[in-house]
């Protein structure tokens, strides 16, 4: 009894550095007054479980409870085994769903002498999914069969999920087909997994066979069509769900359909979804909905609605994606000045830009002919925010310089791009600028660079041939055409929309 009570003050240590509510709960745990050592142990274990459930997203809280659990001697107790297992499972769940899932497997390995239940293996399989570790998933599958939990529906569903996430769809379907009883979650996991990996026909077939379709089921199949760049089918399913089936789209449903709306430029649907989101309170409760609406309005050609929605959103709700979305919106509409103004306001409110923000800014400068401003943003990106440009940033800069006729600067920049990220698109961008400005000398140098990297694309030969022809060098143009024939390189035929 004395030994058990001496361990209670350890809880004061793990309270340090945590939130007030967490510390208060721990303080309460240290002042429990049970009648027996077993009751003390059970109440402490229950309190630790409660703390984990309240702070499941905190790695610090999880690790500190984990540490106390190990050092307290609970593991060597022959009593309160059900409470010990509950705490272990809660720890596994926190680790499996958090940012450090590997720690769940390490915890299980260190405690493999305990008698686990089906929930243990469910959480471990979610860990494998989070780690994208098919090898660990296969090992756990074998272990599940060995310990006799292979017929538990939650374990089977977790197996389907782990296999589907890892792309092992044959194994996922095998487990799914062997299940005598499937719940809605199992169906949704299988449909979503198949759709995610591009097996839309099979996914849709399962969707049609599903006994009861929920909003999650509809969202999974809609998201699949959107991901596979089939927006018309996605929009058709969305209408069918909302209008004909009478199922109210969730926030996730809206996030799944926005890319399809943007691809086809369906402004009326965008407006309808906006109105629906307002009625359901999604636009206020979820900033991702607002950000997606801003982006969709801009891609549907309505920059006025995108700008109005951004301005109507309170400063407290706006995040980095909100600012980047409106900057990108102005950029795609050629409104470079407005994009830069939003960037200045963004800095004023203390929001730190990322590489996507700068990419949008450089895009705006390129399409707006704002070369000096673009170069200043490059300098700010490098020196003020220590962001290293990637190939997309370089592509924007070379396009910007090329449009402005500053070809020597563009070539110098292209030659300075690190070899490990340089690709042929950079040189093709510069070749396009050479063609526009009839710069034969540089065009030849750039074409030589392109052919060192890739010889099979006919468009490069044609473009250089056109440069020659544009300045009256018809012999050189003909020579390049003959070289195409000699190398059996074909020009991709164009087509008219008329």
What are these model-predicted stretches?
Residues 1-183, 192-197, 201-214, 223-498:
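Terminal (and in a subset, N-terminal) low-complexity or junction segments at the ends
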């Amino acid at each position: 009894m004395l030994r058990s009570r001496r361990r209670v003050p350890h809880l004061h240590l793990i309270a340090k550095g945590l939130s007030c509510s967490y510390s208060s709960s721990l303080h309460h745990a240290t002042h429990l007054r049970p009648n027996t050592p077993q009751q003390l142990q059970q109440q402490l274990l229950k309190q630790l479980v409660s703390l984990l459930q309240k702070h499941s997203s905190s790695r610090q809280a999880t690790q500190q409870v984990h540490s106390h659990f190990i050092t307290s001697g609970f593991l060597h107790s022959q009593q309160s085994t059900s409470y010990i297992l509950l705490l272990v499972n809660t720890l596994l769940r926190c680790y499996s769903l958090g940012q450090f899932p590997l720690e769940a497997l390490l915890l299980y390995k260190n405690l493999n002498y305990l008698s686990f239940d089906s929930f243990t293996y469910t959480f471990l399989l979610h860990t494998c999914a989070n780690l994208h570790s098919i090898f660990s998933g296969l090992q756990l599958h074998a272990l599940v069969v060995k310990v006799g939990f292979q017929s538990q529906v939650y374990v089977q569903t977790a197996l389907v999920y782990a296999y589907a996430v890892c792309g092992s769809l044959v194994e996922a379907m095998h487990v799914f087909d062997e299940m005598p009883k499937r719940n809605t979650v199992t169906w949704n996991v299988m449909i979503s997994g198949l759709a995610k990996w591009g097996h839309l026909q099979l996914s849709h077939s399962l969707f049609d066979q599903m006994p009861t379709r929920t909003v999650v089921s509809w969202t999974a199949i809609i998201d699949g069509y959107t991901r596979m760049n089939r927006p018309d089918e996605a929009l058709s399913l969305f209408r069918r769900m909302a209008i004909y089936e009478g199922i109210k789209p969730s926030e996730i449903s809206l996030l799944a359909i926005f890319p399809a709306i943007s691809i086809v430029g369906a402004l009326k649907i965008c407006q309808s979804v906006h109105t629906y989101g307002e009625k359901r309170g999604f636009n206020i409760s979820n900033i991702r909905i607002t950000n997606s609406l801003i982006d969709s309005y801009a891609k549907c050609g309505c920059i006025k609605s995108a700008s109005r929605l951004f301005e109507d959103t309170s400063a407290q709700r706006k995040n980095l994606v909100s600012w980047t979305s409106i900057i990108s919106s102005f950029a795609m509409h050629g409104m470079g000045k407005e994009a830069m103004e939003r960037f200045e306001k963004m800095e004023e409110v203390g929001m730190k830009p990322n590489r996507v923000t700068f990419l949008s800014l450089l895009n705006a400068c390129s399409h707006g002919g704002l070369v000096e401003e673009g170069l200043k943003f490059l300098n700010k990106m490098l020196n003020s925010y220590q962001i290293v440009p990637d190939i997309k940033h370089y592509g924007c800069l070379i396009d910007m310089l090329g449009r402005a006729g500053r070809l020597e600067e563009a070539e110098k920049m292209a030659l300075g791009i690190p070899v490990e990220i340089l690709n042929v698109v950079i040189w093709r961008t510069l070749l396009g600028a050479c063609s526009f400005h009839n710069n034969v000398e540089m065009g030849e140098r750039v074409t030589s660079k392109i052919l060192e990297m890739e010889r099979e694309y006919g468009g490069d030969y044609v473009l250089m041939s056109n440069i020659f022809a544009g300045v009256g060098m018809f012999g050189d143009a003909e020579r390049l055409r003959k070289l195409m024939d000699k190398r059996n390189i074909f020009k991709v035929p164009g087509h008219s929309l008329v």
